């Protein structure tokens, strides 16, 4: 038993040591090696136990945690980010965050905190971000919450129950990059509550009613740079100027987001912007203009310009009574100093000529995502309209003719940049007229399939991305930047068309290859973005991309965005990491080697066939098979001859005068087959030989020096040789008419040579006394 306890203790010690320094991972959390723990949306009712000093970031948002205790986080001394948003937290004990001196990010938004305590935040001297939006507290506490948060840069407070801003609320804060206050139902504002904050870069104020807004604005004039007003109904907004326009202000920008404006409140906004003389930019986003454009306030006539306003941005403006709206002529004079105007997605179909002429300082005009057509654009760009305009953006309107659009804009003498992308032009005329100073033209996403001389020669920047171009064959001598992504090109454009090119973007399934020669031909090219294409990873392409040392200096998205699409076995691999086999990369050499090997094999086979008479074997086999396959016109006949005699023409005297006499005139007579006498005239000689041998019981070869030299005797000997193998019999009778060396018989007739070596053959005797015995033996051999 003691031994078992000792073993358990040792194992426990080892496990404990192995876990030292690594954050404990309760089952409800997932932690990575860097100490980032994720416990979002896991229906947790409390903060998990077992958290250690190794935890650097803890996200427990979207759970059901109801409280935070003093001991829940006391070991997390290195914690930098704590997210407890969207829980049910209603209680936080006084010392819950006492050990979190390294904490920089704290999110307690959307909980049920009815009271806030300064003791929570007192230890958090490193805190930079604090979000307290969306609970149920009505004030920011009895004492200053943030007086010890000297490093705080982003603060978000307030909720729909928040009713009061007090003078002490922001004490101790001197500089904030962003302050967001949900003051939807704010009822009381203590004057000078923001005075303690010396600088606020961005104030986001959500207010339903604007009653307290003027007072807040006046309090922040000297400390605020950017004011954003959200979700406000300005029907009762009234700004009473307390003095001449304020010059000692920091505010540079106003944003009205989801704000409802009436004709009357518009007049008040104009007065406000005029009073805050430093405002240079005004933005209206998702706003509603609930009026008819009847701006009748007498004071507006006294205002010739709106302070220093230079930039006006309007996005998604809604005008419920759009078709009853007036022409805005009463405020034309207010626009003369505006330099930049953006009106997006607001159903603009016309800028009246008179308004265009009043926009004397306008340099930038963006009318994207509206209803402009060529006919109304002509009225907008009338003579003396927009005299200073340099940039015009008409993206995603209803323009349909490139020729008409260019001709309409000829009145804009200073226009250098034009964006008419995402219009439905579909085609490009052969020639066009454009303002003479045009340097930039955006024709992306206009569905054209070819380029013509319509493109102005003065361009330095051309964007023709996302079209249906199959080729680029247009000379543009001054173009320095070309954007041609998402087209149907196969390779880079010819460098001779673009001699001054510095930057080219040709990514996203536009090309499938390019070469070193093509890249080098662009002598001034400094930047190329060609990633995201379906590259054919050929051996040449891989060799170039992997051997070129300076490729990453030109290709700005190399190597991450360069992937192979083919061959299929390397699809999806990075071009930089892809390698093909020797057989794929040296196909010509491989084919040459195979051809050489094949040629040598054929040559060797030919030599062997010649040496071993292979050609003869094939020729004879073919002839034999052809003869065997020929249809028989007559029924199969029996043996017609006792013997077929194969002999040389020079030995015909011996055969015809001696052999024939002795055999055919013998009683009973033998029937011999002689080629001179019995071959059928007109029949193929080889067929005659084969038929005669097949119809004969035996084949007699009259061997002599003449026989060996005779070509036809060789044929007869050849086919007899096949018969020996075909029928496996000994039908051959050899007669040596004169002494002959066995070696004179060709070696390919192995069967005949074997017969001469293993069986008796007849030799013609010169002695007449022995000739009778010769004939006797021959007759016996034929009968056998």
From Swiss-Prot:
Q: Start-end of the LRR repeats?
A: 54-77, 78-101, 102-125, 126-150, 151-175, 176-199, 200-223, 224-250, 251-278, 279-308, 309-337, 338-361, 362-388, 389-414, 415-437, 438-457, 458-478, 479-500, 501-524
Question: Tell me, what is one Gene Ontology molecular-function annotation carried by this entry?
Answer: transmembrane signaling receptor activity
Q: Where is the TIR domain?
A: 639-782
List all topological domains (Extracellular): 21-587
Glycosylation: which residues?
Answer: 115, 199, 414, 442
- Topological domains on the Cytoplasmic side lie at 609-784
GO cellular component term, pick one: receptor complex
Report the SUPFAM superfamilies cross-referenced here: L domain-like (SSF52058), Toll/Interleukin receptor TIR domain (SSF52200)
Localization per Swiss-Prot or TrEMBL: Membrane; Cytoplasmic vesicle, Phagosome membrane; Membrane raft
The answer to whether keyword NAD applies is yes
Q: How does the record classify its membrane topology? A: Single-pass type I membrane protein
Q: How does it assemble?
A: Interacts with LY96, TLR1 and TLR6 (via extracellular domain). TLR2 seems to exist in heterodimers with either TLR1 or TLR6 before stimulation by the ligand. The heterodimers form bigger oligomers in response to their corresponding ligands as well as further heterotypic associations with other receptors such as CD14 and/or CD36. Binds MYD88 (via TIR domain). Interacts with TICAM1. Interacts with CNPY3. Interacts with ATG16L1. Interacts with PPP1R11. Interacts with TICAM2. Interacts with TIRAP.
Family, according to the entry, reads as follows:
Belongs to the Toll-like receptor family.
Q: What is known of its domains?
A: Ester-bound lipid substrates are bound through a crevice formed between the LRR 11 and LRR 12.
What's this protein's name? Answer: Toll-like receptor 2
- Organism source for this protein? Equus caballus
């Amino acid at each position: 038993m003691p031994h078992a306890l000792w073993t358990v203790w040792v194992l426990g010690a080892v496990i404990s040591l192995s876990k030292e320094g690594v954050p404990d991972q309760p089952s409800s959390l997932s932690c990575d090696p860097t100490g980032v723990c994720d416990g979002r949306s896991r229906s947790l009712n409390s903060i998990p136990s077992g958290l250690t000093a190794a935890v650097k970031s803890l996200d427990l948002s979207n759970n059901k945690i109801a409280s935070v205790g003093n001991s829940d986080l006391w070991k997390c001394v290195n914690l930098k980010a704590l997210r407890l948003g969207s829980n049910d937290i209603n209680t936080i004990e006084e010392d819950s965050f006492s050990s979190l001196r390294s904490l920089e990010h704290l999110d307690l938004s959307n909980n049920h905190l009815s009271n806030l305590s300064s003791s929570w935040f007192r230890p958090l001297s490193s805190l930079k971000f604090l979000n307290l939006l969306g609970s149920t507290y009505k004030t920011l506490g009895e004492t200053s919450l943030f007086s010890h948060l000297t490093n705080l840069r982003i603060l978000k407070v307030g909720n729909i129950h928040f009713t009061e801003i007090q003078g002490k609320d922001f004490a101790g804060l001197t500089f904030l990059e962003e302050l967001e206050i949900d003051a939807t139902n704010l009822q009381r504002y203590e004057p000078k509550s923001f005075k303690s904050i010396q600088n606020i870069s961005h104030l986001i104020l959500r207010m339903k009613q604007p009653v307290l807004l003027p007072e807040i604005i006046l309090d922040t004039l000297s400390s605020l740079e950017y004011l954003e007003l959200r979700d406000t109904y300005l029907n009762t907004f009234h700004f009473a100027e307390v003095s001449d326009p304020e010059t000692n202000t920091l505010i540079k920008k106003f944003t009205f987001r989801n704000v409802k404006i009436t004709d009357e409140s518009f007049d008040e906004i104009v007065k406000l912007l005029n009073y805050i003389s430093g405002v240079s930019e005004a933005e209206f986003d998702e706003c509603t203009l609930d009026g008819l454009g009847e701006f009748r306030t007498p004071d507006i006539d006294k205002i010739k310009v709106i302070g220093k306003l230079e930039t006006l941005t309007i996005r998604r403006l809604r005008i419920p009574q759009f078709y009853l709206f007036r022409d805005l002529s009463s405020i034309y004079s207010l626009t003369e100093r505006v330099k930049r105007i953006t009106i997006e997605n607001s159903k603009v179909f016309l800028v009246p000529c008179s308004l265009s002429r009043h926009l004397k300082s306008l340099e930038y005009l963006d009318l994207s995502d509206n209803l402009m057509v060529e006919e109304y654009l002509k009225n907008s760009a009338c003579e003396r309209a927009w005299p200073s305009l340099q940039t015009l953006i008409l993206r995603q309107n209803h323009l349909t003719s490139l020729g008409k659009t260019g001709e309409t804009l000829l009145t804009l003498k200073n226009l250098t940049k034009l964006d008419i992308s995402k219009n439905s032009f579909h085609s490009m005329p052969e020639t066009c007229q454009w303002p003479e100073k045009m340097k930039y033209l955006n024709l992306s996403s206009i569905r054209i399939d070819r380029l013509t001389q319509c493109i102005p020669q003065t361009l330095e920047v051309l964007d023709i991305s996302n079209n249906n171009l199959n080729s680029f064959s247009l000379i543009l001598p001054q173009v320095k930047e070309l954007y041609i992504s998402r087209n149907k090109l196969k390779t880079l454009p010819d460098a001779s068309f673009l001699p001054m090119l510095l930057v080219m973007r040709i990514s996203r399934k536009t090309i499938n290859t390019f070469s070193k020669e093509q890249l080098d031909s662009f002598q001034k090219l400094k930047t190329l973005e060609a990633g995201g294409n379906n590259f054919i990873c050929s051996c040449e392409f891989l060799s170039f991309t992997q051997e070129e040392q300076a490729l990453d200096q030109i290709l700005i998205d190399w190597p991450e965005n360069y992937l192979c699409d083919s061959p299929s076995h390397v699809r999806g691999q990075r071009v930089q990491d892809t390698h093909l086999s020797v057989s794929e990369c040296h196909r010509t050499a491989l084919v040459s080697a195979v051809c050489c090997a094949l040629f040598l094999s054929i040559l060797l086979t030919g030599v062997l066939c010649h040496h071993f008479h292979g050609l003869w074997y094939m020729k004879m086999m073919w002839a034999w098979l052809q003869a065997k396959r020929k249809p028989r016109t007559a029924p199969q006949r029996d043996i017609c001859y006792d013997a077929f005699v194969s002999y040389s023409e020079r030995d015909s005297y011996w055969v015809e005068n001696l052999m024939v006499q002795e055999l055919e005139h013998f009683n009973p007579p033998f029937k011999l087959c002689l080629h001179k006498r019995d071959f059928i005239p007109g029949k193929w000689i080889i067929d005659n030989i084969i038929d005669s041998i097949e119809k004969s019981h035996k084949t007699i070869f009259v061997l002599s020096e003449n026989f060996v030299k005779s070509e036809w005797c060789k044929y007869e000997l050849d086919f007899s040789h096949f018969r020996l193998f075909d029928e496996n019999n000994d039908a051959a009778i050899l007669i040596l008419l004169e002494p002959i060396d066995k070696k004179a018989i060709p070696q390919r007739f192995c069967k005949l040579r074997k017969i001469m070596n293993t069986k008796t053959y007849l030799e013609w005797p010169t002695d007449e006394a022995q000739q009778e015995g010769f004939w006797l033996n021959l007759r016996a051999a034929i009968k056998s």
